[in-house]
A protein has these predicted regions:
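Rossmann-fold dinucleotide-binding core
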Residues: 95-175
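NAD(P)+-binding Rossmann beta1-loop-alpha1 motif at the extreme N-terminus of oxidoreductases
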Residues: 1-63, 88, 93, 124, ...
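Helical "substrate-binding/catalytic lid" subdomain
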Residues: 164-288
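Rossmann-fold NAD(P) dinucleotide-binding segment
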Residues: 50-115
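Hydrophobic beta-strand scaffold residues
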Residues: 26, 46, 115-116, 157, ...
Length: 300
């Protein structure tokens, strides 16, 4: 089966490697061609545009940063929508707004193309092993037709329903939880550190309790060492919080903690932490409190 992938960043490159590993004939496109080098070495085939990728594949996955990029890939002059292959199915892995998903799905339908939303949970290491969690909404027949491909990259698959954009709401809600947990853990670490307590002992105690999380277990020990190598950029977390806050208005709700989290991550980006891992919110808090976090990129 010929599968296409547009977007070979941190997540996309590992998803591509996984698809090649399990034997799919993979075509790839990325805005920056050099970022596909390793994938090509592993057997992937480069194409010059999303349109050409659509001509060659029966199923195209898109894994990009934001809604603007996704709409350009789908609806732009060389977009998937202009492919001659009207049997093409498009699966969107990107974390974008529900409204952008609805807009693109409607535009693709006018051209006789089918699509669905499939944002995923799990970082690049999880993607490499094919153990992502997939949250899916949209055309059920298209999903069923490509379920083997989906199962090759996801260990858990949740179908939210046929309404376009539903999966995006769930994804944003999940990322909001991650952002808030990251802030809470960061503030706790800073609090005990300023009290003269070894933060390593605090993390050990925390991880021995019922309240431990995968974040505290996997990220906590790195955070106290100022190790913020990006697996999910702080700037991308801010983008997701902005999407969530923007989507509150049509839902007619107010989520105060989410708004505060957005403001904190915005301030962290303004101080120069955007390209670090989202857990660098701890580094920002140290900076904000007049402490210089050692051994990492400093605020500006």
């Amino acid at each position: 089966m010929k599968v296409g992938l547009v977007g070979t960043g941190l997540m996309g490159s590992e998803i591509a490697s996984r698809l090649l590993e399990v034997g799919y004939d993979l075509y790839v496109h990325n805005r920056t061609r050099s970022k596909t080098g390793e994938i090509i070495k592993k057997g992937g085939k480069w194409v010059d545009s999303p349109k050409e990728l659509g001509n060659r594949c029966s199923f195209a996955l898109v894994c990009v940063t934001d809604g603007t990029a996704f709409k350009q890939i789908c609806l732009g002059n060389d977009g998937l929508i202009h492919s001659l292959n009207k049997e093409l199915v498009i699966g969107n892995l990107s974390t974008i707004s529900p409204s952008d998903s609805v807009e693109c799905a409607a535009a693709l339908r006018k051209y006789g193309m089918r699509s669905f939303q499939m944002p995923v949970m799990g970082g690049p290491d999880i993607a490499k092993k094919g153990e992502l969690v997939a949250i899916i909404s949209g055309d059920k027949n298209s999903i069923d037709k490509n379920i083997r491909v989906i199962e090759s990259i996801a260990r858990s698959i949740f179908y939210i329903g046929k309404i376009d954009g539903a999966a995006n709401y769930v994804k944003l809600a999940l990322n909001m939880n991650i952002a808030l947990i990251g802030i809470a853990l960061s503030e706790s670490i800073l609090y005990v550190t300023k009290a003269g307590i070894d933060p390593g002992i605090f993390i050990e105690i925390f991880n021995s309790t019922y309240f431990r999380t995968s974040l505290s277990e996997k990220k906590g020990p790195k955070m106290i060492k100022n190790d913020f190598e990006a697996r999910f950029h702080l700037g991308n977390m801010l983008k997701d919080l902005q999407l969530l806050v923007a989507s509150m208005k049509p839902l007619n709700i107010s989520l105060p903690l989410s708004v505060l989290a957005e403001q904190m991550y915005q301030a962290a980006r303004n101080r120069g932490y955007s390209e670090l891992d989202y857990t660098a919110i701890l580094a920002f808090l140290k900076d904000f409190n007049g402490l210089q976090p050692d051994g990492i990129k400093q605020g500006i």
